[in-house]
Amino acid sequence: MARLSQFAATFLLLASALLSSQGLFADYKQAKALYSKKNYPKAAEAFFQVYEKSPKKVEKRKAEWGLAQSLEKMNLAYSASKYYSVIVRRGRIPENPFFRSALEELGKINSRISLGQSHIVQLFKTEIRLADVPGPARGFYFYYKGVEAFGDKSLETADKHFEMVPSGSPYQLGALFHQGVIANLQGRHSRAIALFEKVLAGTRDRSEYRELQEMSLMNIARVNYEIKRFAEAISYYGQIPRDSENWLDAIWESSWAFFFIEKFNNTLGNIHTIHSPFFENRFYPEAYILQAITFLRMCRFDQVKESMKRFKDRYQPVFGDVRGMMNRYKGDPKGFFKFIYDYRSGSITSYRKAEEIVKKLSQVDAFKEAMDTIRFTDRELNALKSKGSSWKGGALLEDVTNFLESKKSTAILDAGQRVYKEGNGYYAQLLDLSNQTKLIVAEMQLGKLANLRALISIGDADKKAQFIGGLQQLNINQTLEFWPFEGEYWEDELGFYVYNMPSKCNVQKDSK
Amino acid sequence: MKALLPKCSKLVLDSGRSSLIALLAFAFIESGLTQAVEAAEDPGTPSAEAERFKDTEIRVIRPRYFNKSKRFELGAAMNAIMNESFIYTFMATGIATFHLNEEWAIEGTLSYGLNLDREDKRVLFDEFDIKTQIFRTQYQAELAIQYTPIYGKWQLPSGRLIYFDTYLTAGLGQTGIEWKYDDFCEAPSPTDPNAEALPTNAVKGYPTFMVGGGQRYFVNRTTSYRFEIKFHRFLFNEIDAECTPLKAEATGQQFATGTAHDVITILLGISRFF
């Protein structure tokens, strides 16, 4: 009797195990069927069940892939990237059949919406053999390997990785751009210019690459500036469109180029633009120093003093607020990020005098990247409220939501740290400039003008080129228009100002 | 509303000169001294234009937005006579201009139009039996010289800039007047065998002198809208306005051959530069 009952119990157990296994198998099949019927929300939920509960590894892997695919079909690319990333991080092993496909999918997602550099760098910590990287994902893979090496200052390794980015890949232009930067850092200026020119050719008339195109123009200008081809540098700065965020930087940097070819009236004209009320919250403190030394070169000593005074008047109140702000957020990167975020949304209440630095910080790449991540994650979190509402039990919703929240939090933390560091840099720059103004004033008071002018002496740069306003070289076939500046700023005139102020140096020599 | 202040780089208008002819003569002489600013000039070296701004500490120097020099301008416009009391005159106008440089141009205009009687004319006749003498302008053909002393810009409240120029014009031509004698002549009495028949309605041309001024508003680098007001003086033969010219001549009455009649026109149009 006891035997019979033992047998019955064993039978029942076996039967239940069989049933349960059939049930799981049936779940995966059901998930696949739902996916085939394009019922992606239900398919995602079913795949997640299998992914979580199935004891079978093969089935689990398939469910993981199916889950990621379903989420992507639901336009939840960030959420899908979580599961693709799990697959990729596992590496190329026999029981990970979707490795190559997942890598390819991540590359596609990242070319549409940035996954964030830290996410991708983490992804490629796993050692991957070249043969294991599928063709379409090579651009994605090598580009970020290059970026990682570049960040570590391993320029040659980075260059090799960028070189491996195949032509035609959406990452190729970015790779060429980085190679240009590397070439310049290695002192190969002609190669750097050639690479940036390639980027320019590749981005022409493609609005999605506008930022890359402008940065290439800026970099060609900077390389030319570095090798003292100032006129060429100015012509590249002059190609930055007026409506670009980089335009004022181009005006500012070209002021130095004008200074070195002794076009002081153009230098002062550009600074006049920078100091216009249109840009009163833009952070260019060095403009006062350049203005002062330009006047110094023109032996206009009263105006040197005036420039120094204006620097002091403008930036002395800023110091206190910047110092207070940096002290307040020391060790609190998330708080610092939020502070800048609040500034962007127009709700800043403290450290108002530091506004131009805060504005500048809100435009650095780290902050903009984090803002993109926040925007994309928030968009998905909102979408999940409706798309994920049908998911029973809430485990999938919780898993995806946790991932998105954590991604956002990491992005904020990382950006907060990087932006704070940048802010410290600006503060140090202000201090340094303040010391420079004191030096100039002190030297002037001591009458050591010759020493001071010698310090800022200009080399044998090509001074033949003639420039009108707007960073444009004089063209003999052009008819010009002149507008006097009479204290009223017109928006269309910004960038076109040219001073009409002779140097007093010869007069002084003559009078001696 | 934001103040719309023009800025003018080439203001040579002298308010002390009341005569347009004198102004044009002055402008012509002046233009011999100040040519359009050619880029060959070094902005850092003295030139006519630099001289004009020699006391300006900060100036904008840039390629001119709209160049007219050595360009043809063809346009179409609607012209209306403003000072005829009893008729409306609207004329379709064709404009052809060649710009010698930024300041000087030669312009030909041809207008042809229709005349519509005003209500006043009908009321005068119906209620008071008064017939009115009317100069019905049928066409105007003029060749003029044009001088542009002002090139400027306006900023609209939206921030958009509109460049414009202001010109003065003077020229010679011919005005065609349509004489409709039943407008103002009494029909001859059928019972009077000596009555002279009314002259046949006809269009007669008279020499015309014209002065005026206008503005072009440049909407882009090839197109502009035009607005102008012109004063035309034509010299007509008095006998052409006579209801019984044969009888009048027979009585030895003297008729002036150059009696002036003035017409003021306003023009709105669009033109394209080639």
Please place each PLM-identified region on the residue numbering.
Chain A
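"A position-specific structural signal for the A-helix of alpha-solenoid helical repeats
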Residues: 29, 66, 105, 137, ...
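TPR-repeat structural position
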Residues: 40, 77, 116-117, 155, ...
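Alpha-helical segment of the N-proximal tetratricopeptide repeat
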Residues: 25-49, 138-152
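Extracytoplasmic/secretory-pathway proteins
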Residues: 48, 98-99, 105-129, 133-134, ...
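Short solvent-exposed coil/turn linkers within tandem alpha-helical repeat scaffolds
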Residues: 51-60, 87-101, 114-118, 126-139, ...
